[in-house]
Every structure is written in C-alpha cells, then in structure tokens.
Amino acid sequence: MEDIMQLPKARVNASMLPQYIDRPVCFVGKLEKIHPTGKMFILSDGEGKNGTIELMEPLDEEISGIVEVVGKVTAKATVLCASYTLFKEDTNRFDLELYNEAVKIINELPQFFPVGLPQHE
C-alpha cells in the first residue's frame, strides 16, 4: 500500500467521515477528550460534531487545542491516524467555524477543488 502521506487527502468534517471510508483524509478539530489508554482521542469540528481518532501507539506527548490529523477513515467512520500536527495558538486564534465553512465549500464544488477526489473524464 502506498504511503498515506504521499496520497491526496480530502479535507473533511465529522459529518463527512462516513462518505470517505477507506480513503485518506485530513481532519482538523479541537481536542475534547483523550482515552485513558492514550490510543484514541476525540476532536470536535467547526460544527461541534465529534470525530474519533485512533492511534497505532499511545500518545507520547501532551496534546491540547486545535489538532490536524492525517489518516484513513475506518469502517466505523473513525480516523486511523498516520500523523497529527498541533496548532500553536499563542498569537493567532484558529477559527474552526470558518475553516469548517471552507471544508464544506471545497466538498460542494469538487470541480474547483479536486484534491482527494477521483477524477472522471
């Protein structure tokens, strides 16, 4: 299987996860909860809906705030994390609601934003 980091990834919110099963995605959300095992956490998107992120290994660092996750959507509509990035909010606040609006537009107009979608000629 090709490395997921090399594949095009659709930007999605929590409601869109069931449409992307077995496909690579990028999910951005606010950390709500970390499972006690450290192998799963919950992110809320710009609509306040939750997405579950699964990890291969337990977290080895403290995470908080806004997190961008790249991974593959599982059959349970969770994201199996390949990598994550913490957004630093020291100087600028990340507007998750505005980001969510952009994600919806990108998905509503695939002819203008084709990244992560199969191309049909």
Swiss-Prot record:
PTMs per UniProt = Ubiquitinated by RFWD3 at stalled replication forks in response to DNA damage: ubiquitination by RFWD3 does not lead to degradation by the proteasome and promotes removal of the RPA complex from stalled replication forks, promoting homologous recombination.
Q: Where in the cell is it found?
A: Nucleus
- UniProt GO MF annotations: damaged DNA binding; single-stranded DNA binding
A biological process term (GO) from this entry = mismatch repair
| Record SUPFAM superfamilies | Nucleic acid-binding proteins
Against InterPro entries, the record matches this protein to: NA-bd_OB-fold, Rfa2
Q: Name one GO cellular component term.
A: nucleoplasm
Q: Where is this cross-link: Glycyl lysine isopeptide (Lys-Gly) (interchain with G-Cter in ubiquitin)?
A: 39, 88
Which UniProt key words apply to this protein? DNA damage, DNA recombination, DNA repair, DNA replication, Isopeptide bond, Nucleus, Ubl conjugation
Q: Which Pfam families match?
A: Rep_fac-A_3 (PF08661)
Q: Does the keyword Membrane apply?
A: no
Q: What does this protein do?
A: As part of the heterotrimeric replication protein A complex (RPA/RP-A), binds and stabilizes single-stranded DNA intermediates, that form during DNA replication or upon DNA stress. It prevents their reannealing and in parallel, recruits and activates different proteins and complexes involved in DNA metabolism. Thereby, it plays an essential role both in DNA replication and the cellular response to DNA damage. In the cellular response to DNA damage, the RPA complex controls DNA repair and DNA damage checkpoint activation.
What the record says about family reads:
Belongs to the replication factor A protein 3 family.
Q: How does it assemble?
A: Component of the canonical replication protein A complex (RPA), a heterotrimer composed of RPA1, RPA2 and RPA3. Also a component of the aRPA, the alternative replication protein A complex, a trimeric complex similar to the replication protein A complex/RPA but where RPA1 and RPA3 are associated with RPA4 instead of RPA2.
How is this protein named in the record?
Replication protein A 14 kDa subunit
Give the source species.
Mus musculus
